[in-house]
Amino acid sequence: MHRRKAFIRQTFGGFTLIELLVVIAIIAILMAILMPALNRAREQGKRAVCLNNLKQLGLAWILYADDNDDNIVNGDTEESGTFGPPSSGAAYMPGGRHHQERPWVLKDWDAGMTLDDKINAIKGGALFLYCGKNLRLYKCPIAGREEGQEQRQRTYSVVDAMNVQPYDGGPMIKKRTSIKGPPERSVFIEDAGATPMGGWSIYYTQNAWRDEPPVKHGNGANWSFADGHSEYWKWQNPDTRKWSVDNEGQWKAVVRPGDVDIYRARKAAWGKLPD
């Protein structure tokens, strides 16, 4: 009788090894099912924060123009230095396209720059006050996943057409009233490159990428537009993400006639195209 009670206690008083293995297996299966959904939810949350960052930057961009006789802010950070000779480049010299134009962010990427240097470059830019002095608006929450991104304090760039440079002969705009169809014209974009120098470039005269298309958020990118709204674009060509990853920092022009992603990005960046 005592032996039977002991057996019952061993059987029902705790889990057997087999029962524990079954429970662990069930938990593993549930985790395998739930983790992709949790990751997607986490990414959607970060995407929403990024979209809001771009929207706030876009509104700051509009407010700046309102306060400056409709002149849009200088979007070129590559040669800005400390905004003045001798460290600034030719674009900032008399006769240059950005003479006496403070950029939205001072040059914030160069060899030897410290974290404080990069933060001060943002604070010294023309939009910092219009952004409510909020440093978080300048960086996508997903930054840090890619190599080198954790060293960046800014992950957004201005497209070349919006007072950066007339790349590939494209029309560069300086007045907000000169923008035709503001809801379709991009201003800020996530920068997929290894560094955020200058603006974001794409070819004007041919259907080709110049800077890599951003692919931080799944297989798509967040953009802001000249009317102040922001939106997410999902790339249609399955090769877009692969091209971006394979060509990071190489600025390699590969003409792709008929590529809908390139054409759409070119239209947003430049407006009316020559082709």
Model-assigned labels for residue ranges:
Residues 1-15:
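N-terminal leader/signal peptides at the extreme start of proteins
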Residues 4, 42-49:
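Intracellular coupling helices
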Residues 11-42:
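N-terminal single-pass transmembrane signal-anchor helix
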Residues 48-275:
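Short, well-structured segments within or immediately adjacent to enzyme catalytic domains
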